[in-house]
Amino acid sequence: MALTTYVKGRAYDWSHAIGRASANGTGFNYPQTMCLGNDGDVYVANRGNENNFGMRVNHIKVGGPGEEELLAEFATYGEKDENCVWPFGVAVGKNGDVYVTDEWKSTVSVFDAKGKFVRKWGTPGNGPGELKGPAGIVCEASGNLIVVDSGNNRLQVFTPEGKLVSQCGKAGSGEGEFNKPWGIALDKDGNIYVADWKNHRVQKLSPTGKFLMSIGRYGKVPVASNAFAVTYLGPFISSVPDAERAPAGILNHPTGVAVDPDGDIYVADWGNHRLCIFDKDGKALTHLVGDAQVMSKWGQQSIDANPDMMKAYRRVQNLEQLWRFCFPTAVVFNPKTDQIIVADSQRNRLQIYKKMRDYVDFQANL
C-alpha cells in the first residue's frame, strides 16, 4: 500500500513510528488506549502481559520523526492505591489531572499532571454508580468524565470526584444498546462515539446519550491458510497481509474511535488489523493498514545496542508484515498537528499518519 492515501479531497500520509517492546522506559507493552494531553502530548495505557510485566501509563511527546520523548510513566502494576492491575482507559481533565480506569479493580485512579497519585474512586458492582470492568474514559467540556462501563454494557457520567451524574445504555444489539463497549471519543459538539466491540459497530450518541447513528457493519478480511495469533484476549484467527483487501465499511471487533474537526471518524478495526475512516455521515472513505517501513528511533536504539538483532532482521525474507498493523486498539487525532496516532498493540508501537489539507496531486504534462 502507498505511503500516501488520497480519497475524496483528503490525503493521509504516513509519518513515522514510535516505540519498541519494553516493560518500562522508552517503549510499550501492549498499548491499549490513548488520549491527548492539554499540550498535545499523549498518554498511553499499557495492558502488559500475563506475567504482570509492563502495566503502566506512558506520558510521551510525539512531535515529528525522531522527536519522540518519554516524559514520565506511572500507574505501574500493584495492589496499592497508586498502582493499577489492568490499566485500560486514560483521559486528561481540564486541570491536567489524569484519569485511569482499572479493568481488574473496577475503579478509576486519578493522578496529577506529573503522575503523582491523587485519589481513587469506583466500586465494583452493577448498581448505579458501580463499575464492572471499566474500559474507555473521556472528559467532557464540563469537566465531567464519561466512563465506558463495559461489563455492565452502559455509559456512566461522573464528576471529577466520582459522584454519579447520569447513565445510559443497556445490554443488547439495538439502538443505544451495547455488547462489551470499548473505546470512546467526543466530537467538537460534544456528541459521543462508542466502539461497540461485540456488536461490530460504532454508535454515535448525543451529549445526553440519545442514539443518533450507527457506523460500520460486521465483516472479516479474507483469512490466509493457517493464520493464527494469540492475544491477551485469547486465540484469534488472524491475517495481517490481507487487511488491505477487505471493504472499507466493514468492522470486526472495533476497539477505538476518534473524530477530527472536519467530522471524519477514525475507527481501530481490531479484528481486521487496520484503521477505517468514515465521513461525518458514517460513509466509508478508506482504510489504512500500517506502513512502518522505517524503524522507530527507540527501536533503532535497541538494534544499535545489539548487532545480533540487526543480523536477524536482515535475514527476514519479507518485511512487509512487520510494517502492518497487528490488532490496533486505539486512535487519537491531534487537531493542532493534524496527526492521526494509532496504537499498534501487538507491535508495541504507535504509528503516526498526517491528514494533509492542502495536498495537490502531481500533474503530468501530457
Question: Which role does the model predict for each range below?
Answer:
Residues M1-L366:
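Eukaryotic scaffold repeat domains enriched in small/polar residues
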